[in-house]
Each structure stands twice: as structure tokens, then as C-alpha cells.
Design a protein with these regions (language model features):
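A short, basic N-terminal segment
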Residues: 1-40, 45, 355
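C-terminal leucine-rich, beta-strand-based interaction scaffolds used for sensing/assembly
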Residues: 2, 6-7, 292, 296-376
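Helix-loop-helix "sensor" segment of P-loop NTPases
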Residues: 201-252, 274-276
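Short, locally clustered residues in the helix-turn-helix/winged-helix DNA-binding domain
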Residues: 34-35, 163, 255, 269, ...
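Conserved Walker B catalytic segment
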Residues: 127-196, 204
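C-terminal helical "lid" of AAA+/P-loop NTPase domains
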Residues: 247-253, 259-273, 311-314, 346
């Protein structure tokens, strides 16, 4: 039987430690916090590998055998009802592989939704609940935390993009969650977030409910040399390698951010290049191919913007990481008015085209940034 070879440079998800690069110290620290019954606020820019680290931690023997591990991403949630929906769905997905007794106990705790849970032809539960079925999010949240308290194993719950709850219309969500978490001794949480300023406020401001509730962890880019060795370890299995010069170019082109490096390495792994040693030109070719693949999606994305908003976005892309968008130099260089920039920046931030972090503005999508710079 022909075995399909797995591309070792994963872009999404987690397979096993073989396909996970480094993070030895971070994994040990996160595991130690969780096994010592501490909650953790994990703060780092998007696509640097927070979710991968969480899954890698959950894979550790001392974690996976002793805990129920649950991961949810709440980036797209808009209110408490959608949060509770995502949490319930995530719990069921984590418990289903563990057998009927385990998931049935959870479903029996959800009295408010019992009539809306369906089963497939094999008798396995399906999360057929609609968001509209959750009439009382607070009641369902109570039921979920009752499950956490009574579960047969302690639970570890990772909530990705946790800062999203600060934008919910219900203004007491932070306090509501904090109170329940504080009173639940059989569950511990990883609060993962990419908007560093918002996450820092949530966990270090005296006026916020989660003040001093968690150990705070940050993530830095993976060491360049370590990453190069990881890349060549896998490339060697197909009799290829990437030169140190080419990898350094790739690493710094994307500021060491894992997802973009993985994306290009994924393409290089299946490259039609005849060279055994992949060089800078191979990296450039892959990046150009990726931008070409994304072209129509980016055109549709930019169609949502007004001409002035697009003009400001292109200016930020061209500057790279400007610290001031209101300086006379910036306004004059790109022929922009102060009021135009103010209005555009507000929209671009709200729609996640750009981010403002540590005093600088950047495009959230580095491929889009390169694409816009090429247009000019």
C-alpha cells in the first residue's frame, strides 16, 4: 500500500512532537504552571505559535493522561451567547474520543440544552445546537462550570483570543467568568491572546476582574539557528537542505513569525527545484507564488475599503512599522490629510487590517503587506 508522505511543515493544527519546532523551555514552563494548578495568560502576536504551543503542552504525557484538555478559539464570537456556544462545542469535541461514559456525563449536565443535542447513526453525539437555542447564556455557563467541578478528571481549558470578551456588549462578562473560575477548583485555564495591550490591561490593571489571577507568559520568535536545524532535519529526508543565507532571508523577511516561515517551508518542501541546496532565489520564488495564489482573495478584501482607507493601508505597508501616522513627514510623503488618516486608521483597526502594538502600526497579514508593496 502506497504511504502518503506528510509535509512536515504544518501550517494549521498539530500532529506530534516530530513536527513541532523547539519551544522546549516554554513547554516545560507552561506544563509546570498547569500541573501546579495555576491559570496562565499567554500573550504573543498572532501567528507566532501560541495555539501550537498549547496543543504541544496538551500532548505531554503528564498532561494528556491526567486531564481533560479543551481548546476553543473565540476570535469570531460577538457576545456571551456565542462564547458559551463555542465553549460547549469545544468541550464535547474534546470528550467524544474518550467514550460514551465521559461525554454522556457532560451532556447530562446541560439540562438547558438537552432537547437540542442530536446523535448520529452510531449513537455518537453531534453539536447540532444553534446559537439561537441558547436562551440563557448565564444558565448554560453555570451548567458548564458545574460539569468542570464534577468531572472525573481535572480539566484544562485553553481560550484563544481571550481579549475578545472585552468587546462583548454584556459589560460584566469578565467579572462573570472570573467569579466562576475562582470558585471552580477542578479546572484551570490558559487565556491566550494576541492583542498585547488589551491582554496586559485585563491581567495587570487593578480595576479589572482578572487582575493578578494568572501567571503571565510571553512568546518570542523561535531562535533562527534552531529553526534552521529543524528545517534541514526534515528537508534531509527528501535529500534537500536550505542554505543558511536563504533561511536567514526567509526568517527576517517575516520577522521570525512562525506561521509565515512554515508556509514558505511547506511550499519549498514540494518545490520542483532541481537543486539539492535551496537558495534565496527558491525562497523568493515561493513567496511570489504565495502572493499570486492570494491575489484574488486580497482584491476582494480591499474592495471593502474606500479609496482613502486603501491609500492609508498602502502607506503603512510601504513604511513597514511606522510609529506616528500623524507626523508631518508621513502625511506629506503620502499626500494624506490628518482627518483622512484618523478616520481610516479607526476603520482599519476595527476590521483587523492593521494592529497598533508597542507604539507601532503594522499590517496584520504580512503576505498582504508584501502584496501591497509590490503594487507600488
Amino acid at each position: 500500500m502506497l504511504m502518503v508522505q506528510t509535509n512536515p511543515f504544518l501550517i494549521e493544527g498539530y500532529l506530534s512532537p516530530d513536527f513541532f519546532c523547539d519551544r522546549v523551555e516554554e513547554t516545560a514552563l507552561l506544563t509546570r504552571h498547569l500541573t501546579n494548578r495555576c491559570n496562565v495568560a499567554l500573550i504573543a502576536p498572532r501567528r507566532l505559535g501560541k495555539s501550537g504551543l498549547i496543543y504541544h503542552c496538551f500532548y505531554q504525557k503528564e498532561i494528556r493522561e491526567q486531564y481533560h484538555c479543551i481548546y476553543i478559539d473565540i476570535y469570531d464570537t460577538k457576545n456571551l451567547g456565542e462564547f458559551v456556544y463555542a465553549l460547549g462545542k469545544g468541550i464535547l469535541a474534546a470528550l467524544k474520543p474518550k467514550g460514551r461514559k465521559v461525554w454522556e456525563f457532560f451532556l447530562n449536565m446541560l439540562q438547558s440544552l438537552k432537547s437540542t443535542i442530536s446523535f448520529d447513526i452510531n449513537g455518537n453525539p453531534e453539536w447540532s445546537v444553534g446559537i439561537g437555542d441558547i436562551q440563557s447564556p448565564d444558565i448554560m455557563l453555570d451548567e458548564i462550570f458545574a460539569y468542570f467541578s464534577q468531572a472525573d478528571k481535572p480539566c484544562l481549558i485553553a481560550i484563544d483570543e481571550f481579549q475578545t470578551i472585552a468587546g462583548y456588549p454584556e459589560k460584566t462578562v469578565e467579572a462573570t467568568l472570573r467569579k466562576r473560575i475562582q470558585n471552580c477548583h477542578n479546572a484551570h485555564f490558559i487565556f491566550s491572546g494576541s492583542k498585547r495591550h488589551m491582554m496586559a490591561l485585563m491581567f495587570t490593571s487593578r480595576s479589572r476582574p482578572f487582575y493578578h489571577s494568572s501567571s503571565i507568559m510571553g512568546l518570542e520568535a523561535i531562535n533562527e539557528q534552531t529553526y534552521l536545524e529543524f528545517a534541514n532535519h526534515h528537508l534531509s529526508k527528501i535529500n534537500k537542505e536550505i542554505s543558511a543565507e536563504a533561511f536567514s532571508y526567509l526568517y527576517h523577511r517575516f520577522d521570525g513569525i512562525t506561521w509565515y516561515i512554515q508556509y514558505v517551508l511547506n511550499m519549498l518542501y514540494t518545490s520542483i527545484s532541481d537543486s539539492r541546496v535551496l537558495g534565496k532565489e527558491d525562497v523568493e520564488y515561493c513567496i511570489e507564488s504565495i502572493l499570486l495564489q492570494h491575489r484574488f482573495a486580497y482584491q476582494a478584501l480591499l474592495f471593502q475599503l474606500t479609496s482613502k482607507q486603501k491609500q492609508v493601508l498602502i502607506a503603512i505597508a510601504r513604511e513597514g512599522s511606522p510609529s506616528s501616522l500623524m507626523s508631518q513627514e508621513f502625511l506629506h510623503k503620502y499626500r494624506l490629510g490628518a482627518s483622512t488618516v484618523q478616520g481610516a486608521v479607526k476603520t482599519l483597526l476595527e476590521r483587523d487590517f492593521i494592529t497598533q502594538d508597542e507604539g507601532v502600526y503594522q499590517l496584520c497579514d504580512k503576505f498582504l503587506k508584501l502584496s501591497l508593496r509590490e503594487e507600488i
